[in-house]
């Protein structure tokens, strides 16, 4: 299980990404249409003034149950350990153990 502080930090990042996402998109759209070098620098400065944790690339996929980042399955939102245990307990409908 991940530390609670790490999970809270990740949730804070998600809130910041949601809060500043629209503003970031507007600045990026303006960057595509601007022709002046000075205006471009001003827009880049605005983009850099946004909080560092508001960038979507700083988000990590985490298991919603344990908070683990490694071995994450996007389809389920779970780490491999939890996915295996839940599949064995028949808590995931449609998931069948493979055999060949």
UniProtKB/Swiss-Prot annotation:
Enumerate the subcellular locations listed in this protein's record, separating them with semicolons: Plastid, Chloroplast
Gene Ontology cellular component list: chloroplast; small ribosomal subunit
User: Where does the protein principally reside?
Assistant: plastid
Q: Which UniProt keywords apply?
A: Chloroplast, Plastid, Ribonucleoprotein, Ribosomal protein, RNA-binding, rRNA-binding
InterPro entries, A to Z: Ribosomal_uS14, Ribosomal_uS14_bac/plastid, Ribosomal_uS14_CS
| GO terms (BP aspect) | translation
Q: Which Pfam families match?
A: Ribosomal_S14 (PF00253)
Source species, domain of life? Eukaryota
**Molecular functions per Gene Ontology:** rRNA binding; structural constituent of ribosome
Q: Does the keyword Ribosomal protein apply?
A: yes
Task: Please state which protein family the record places this protein in.
Answer: Belongs to the universal ribosomal protein uS14 family.
Q: What does this protein do?
A: Binds 16S rRNA, required for the assembly of 30S particles.
What does the subunit comment say?
A: Part of the 30S ribosomal subunit.
Task: Give the protein name, as stated in the record.
Answer: Small ribosomal subunit protein uS14c
């Amino acid at each position: 299980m991940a530390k609670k502080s790490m999970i809270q930090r990740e949730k804070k990042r998600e809130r910041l990404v949601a809060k500043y996402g629209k503003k970031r998109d507007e600045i990026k759209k303006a960057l595509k249409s601007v022709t002046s070098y000075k205006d471009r620098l001003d827009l880049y400065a605005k983009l850099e003034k946004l909080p560092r944790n508001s960038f979507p690339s700083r988000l990590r996929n985490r298991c919603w149950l344990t908070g683990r980042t490694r071995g994450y399955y996007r389809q389920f939102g779970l780490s491999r350990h939890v996915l295996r245990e839940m599949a064995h307990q028949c808590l995931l409908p449609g998931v069948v153990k493979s055999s060949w």
